[in-house]
Amino acid sequence: MKRIILLSLSLVLVYSQKMWGQVNFFDAHVSKYGELEQVLGDKWDKIDSLIVHGPINEADFTTMWKCSFEGKLTVLNLEHAQIENNKIPTRALFKVDRQVIDDPRAYQGVVYLPIRHLILPEGIQEIGDFAFSRMRLEQVNLPKSLRKLGPFSFSSCHWLSTDPLIIPDGITSIPPQCFINCQCFKKLVLPSTLKVIGESAFYNTRIEEVNLPEGLEKIEQGAFAGCNIKKVIIPASLNELPGFLFSMCPYLKEIYIPNHITKIPGSFASWCPLLEKVNIPKSIIEIGVDAFAGDVKLKPIDLPEGLKHIEQDALWYCAIDSIVFPASLEYLGGGSCANWKYIKKIYSLATIPPYCAEDMDNPGDGPFHGYTPNDVPLYVPIGSGEKYRQAFGWNYFTNIIETDKFPTGIVSPKMSNNEQCKVYGRDGKLFIEFPNTPACPVRYSVYSIGGTMIEQGYLTASHTLQMPSRDTYIIYVGNAVYKILM
């Protein structure tokens, strides 16, 4: 019987070895910095899984790098290690002089370190520049003690699939290109302590969902360009928008911009083929070069009174079917309204035609050309028709009509039934009250009975507005319309 049991155990061990392969695990105990290489001895190039106990420094990280680059190490557990100065050293596991080489193992000219799983210890406060760049890293933890990330610290870890990726509370800045080209995680959770997101920090990732926390003060150029984000609500704490912020986001459908922003910068959300909704706040005075260029589904664009400049190619190739240029408009950049193949009517409220610049890419053409038909009705104020017919850019149109009847209504997005609000007037004030916090920002606009717009924007909570005089007002909130006598 005993012989049968022993034989069975032997068979199990042999079978397990065949099933799991040659797993070479090593539990290293070090007593001082720089000792890891000595402790590993001649096993350094045979280990594929390593746990380290005790103090480690930059020299020990170089040893671990060697175990992976020149050996077989793919799993590294540092949860029991004490890292010198609580900081992962700069280029801890990325040696550019050894990895950027002509080598059969190279991917896009770089040999990626084969470590796939990395466990970091609680207690570390900083991860240095390029510390884990260009690795085949799939899983990593960011300890709660972490307070600082270095530029490029996880750059081009294409296979990073820790999902969701949670940036710990206490982090105030995500530096430039920190997670650029990390393409396998879909949800990003940012902390309430975050103040700054650096240039291209999440460029060309596959993020579908991200929270931009209230308190965020600065986002730099291209931070989320090339992502898979579907919807964005920009927090009110942000006072300025950078260029290329959401450019080339192929699944982006909706953007909410807070009401105090004054400029939509160049290439802000260009080449977003599914973008359908974006609000232009009443505070906006300029829409930058290529801001929404190539957004072939972007259709409802309400331009606010106060807008002065629409720059080169800003709305190029959008799906606009009608538009109202406000009386405040002074400048239309070349190509800014080109290739509007669905346009049916245009209104320009300015009595003096806004200046039209020549298209730098198509000399001789102005803002309107290409697929924009020249025979659609262009409605202009009474007495200004001849000025428009003589003005460069506007003289593109053959059907200029003088009128004093300009559109005042705004089509509003729908609210669900459980978001219906209460609208009433009292003591010269208008009250818009929601029983619950809306699930997403709700468009509203307030007009006098004569058609003068009083206010418009997006609501995320109940709102009170001091009205200018006793009158009857029309209020649009979501898909509901209210008539209030003040």
Enumerate the language-model features and the residues they cover.
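Structural signature of tandem-repeat unit edges
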Residues: 23-31, 48-56, 73-86, 99-126, ...
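Low-complexity, Pro/Thr/Ser/Gly/Ala-rich linker/spacer regions in secreted
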Residues: 20-25, 401-417
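Short, T/G/N/S-enriched strand-turn elements that build extracellular solenoid repeat scaffolds
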Residues: 34-43, 59-68, 87-92, 130, ...
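Acidic Gly/Asp/Thr-rich repetitive segments characteristic of extracellular carbohydrate-active
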Residues: 27-46, 454
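Consensus positions within tandem repeat domains that build extended binding/scaffold surfaces
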Residues: 92, 128-131, 150-153, 175-178, ...
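Bacterial Sec-dependent N-terminal signal peptides
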Residues: 1-25
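C-terminal outer-membrane/trafficking sorting elements
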Residues: 412-486
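Membrane-proximal C-terminal cap and juxtamembrane stalk of leucine-rich repeat ectodomains
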Residues: 368-409
